[in-house]
């Protein structure tokens, strides 16, 4: 093998090794930012396919319904505690911040946070779900005003 081919081979090998290293680092970084979705029952009993429970300290998203009577607000701060439930069980959630306008008992929500001991989720974001028939009040008012029937004006045409 002549010197020129040998140098090209080294360059190609170095480029491939660099691409492999870059790909590995990107995948490792993405793995740390993935929030897996769970229901309250899956937190308690594991995913249906694998029966694997989420680890304490794991970042996750939990979707369920806010249990009626479970919302407890701290009067001196923005802290709120509530329970999320589904057909298989419930988990408690702590959140500090402003809740969405659509948040209420019996409403579906998705929380993002970390799993703590005792099936407790420390949330850093709460997203309220709404049904497909929901229309914001401002839009509904505008629609009613735009579709209001014009007032009838009767003109006397007999003159």
From Swiss-Prot:
GO terms for molecular function: heme binding; metal ion binding. It is found in: Cell inner membrane. One of its GO terms (biological process) is cytochrome complex assembly. It is a single-pass type II membrane protein. One of its GO terms (cellular component) is plasma membrane. Pfam families: CcmE. Keywords: Cell inner membrane, Cell membrane, Cytochrome c-type biogenesis, Heme, Iron, Membrane, Metal-binding, Signal-anchor, Transmembrane, Transmembrane helix. Residues 30-159 are periplasmic. Residues 1-8 are cytoplasmic. Residues 130-159 are annotated as: Disordered. The chain crosses the membrane at residues 9-29. The keyword Hydrolase does not apply. Heme binds at residues 130, 134. The keyword Cell inner membrane applies. PANTHER family: CYTOCHROME C-TYPE BIOGENESIS PROTEIN CCME HOMOLOG, MITOCHONDRIAL. Belongs to the CcmE/CycJ family. Heme chaperone required for the biogenesis of c-type cytochromes. Transiently binds heme delivered by CcmC and transfers the heme to apo-cytochromes in a process facilitated by CcmF and CcmH. This is Cytochrome c-type biogenesis protein CcmE 1. It comes from Salmonella choleraesuis (strain SC-B67). The gene is ccmE1.
């Amino acid at each position: 093998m002549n010197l020129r081919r040998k140098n090209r081979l080294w360059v190609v090998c170095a480029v491939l090794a660099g691409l492999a290293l870059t790909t590995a680092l990107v995948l490792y970084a993405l793995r740390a930012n993935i929030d897996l979705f769970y229901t309250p029952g899956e937190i308690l009993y594991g995913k249906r396919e694998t029966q694997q429970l989420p680890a304490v300290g794991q970042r996750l998203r939990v979707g369920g319904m806010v249990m009626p009577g479970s919302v407890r607000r701290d009067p001196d701060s923005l802290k709120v505690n509530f329970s999320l439930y589904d057909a298989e069980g419930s988990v408690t959630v702590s959140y500090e911040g402003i809740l969405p306008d659509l948040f209420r008992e019996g409403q579906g929500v998705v929380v993002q946070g970390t799993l703590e001991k005792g099936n407790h989720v420390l949330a850093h974001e709460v997203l309220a779900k709404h049904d497909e028939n929901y229309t914001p009040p401002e839009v509904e008012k505008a629609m009613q005003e735009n579709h209001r029937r014009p007032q009838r004006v009767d003109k006397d045409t007999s003159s």
